[in-house]
């Protein structure tokens, strides 16, 4: 592709140089035509100002000046038309080369874009794999954290349940202890009353 682009650029450069040469040649012909017109005008003025002895020579010069510039101008006009036609053909050829160059550059840009996209994809593949691996690791860590959280929640719930059971047991033990103390107190009072009654009975029997 590079060779084709270089060839097109070289051809385009050559065409532009030829166009410049033709423009310069056309300008030179126009200048020559203007110079011939000035010479003819000067010869005519000189012919009208010559003395009588030079009138015949002057008329011959006038005839020659009329004839020669006409031929020269005709030839120059033909050359100018040929140059203009060649210039038009060169411009058409240059435009065709430009169109071909634009088409090639368009395809080249498209291919480069595809290569860049492929390169970016290739460059991004390791990063993507690392990202996927890292994401999988993070997901595993999140799963482990969730599992640990569930275990902790269950443990806390079990601790709460155990605490509640212990609290209930303590309350029950306190209640039973209180009841036992009351029973012991009642028993102690009953024994004391019985003891006192026995003492009183024994005292009365002695009397």
Swiss-Prot record:
Q: Which domain of life is it from?
A: Eukaryota
* Places the protein is found: Cytoplasm
- List the residue ranges forming a coiled coil, or say none: 70-102, 162-192
The answer on whether this UniProt entry bears the keyword Lipid biosynthesis reads no
- A Pfam family hit: SIKE
Q: Name one GO molecular function term.
A: protein-macromolecule adaptor activity
GO annotation terms (biological process): negative regulation of hippo signaling
Q: What is known about its subunit structure?
A: Interacts with IKBKE and TBK1 via its coiled coil region. Interaction with TBK1 is disrupted upon viral infection or TLR3 stimulation. Interacts with CDC42BPB. Interacts with SIKE1 which mediates association with the STRIPAK core complex composed of PP2A catalytic and scaffolding subunits, the striatins (PP2A regulatory subunits), the striatin-associated proteins MOB4, STRIP1 and STRIP2, PDCD10 and members of the STE20 kinases, such as STK24 and STK26.
Q: Which family does it belong to?
A: Belongs to the SIKE family.
Q: What is this protein called?
A: Suppressor of IKBKE 1
Q: Which organism is it from?
A: Bos taurus (Bovine)
